[in-house]
């Protein structure tokens, strides 16, 4: 049996949303087929539906960090944008991922080094919230197999959100 679920900052206990600023998360990701840890953001108003993926790792390839920007569903002419960083095994030790979100600019960092950025008017300008989760199975990561060590844990050592509302 596998139990998993997201932790997000848009819950009934206390909504933490922001428009522009920095989110930094210290993580240790699990390795193994079928495991899919992610740090991502969604809009408070689910109608517009842009999505910012700060970190995604497929467990069978922990040496590849994926970052994505999915524009609004209402903008059919805007393709998804993504970047894959290879060479650092994220299942080995702790790593810090960070997103700096400014008007018309998104910048991704891994362990203090800038790894990707996007600019343009499609950068969200509405309140968003943070989601931390470990998905198991599904089409994208595939099912766990005999090589997957369970239980598996997506460890979060800390989350820091700095709001930076423009003047």
Report each predicted region and the residues it spans.
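GH16 jelly-roll
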Residues: 1-167
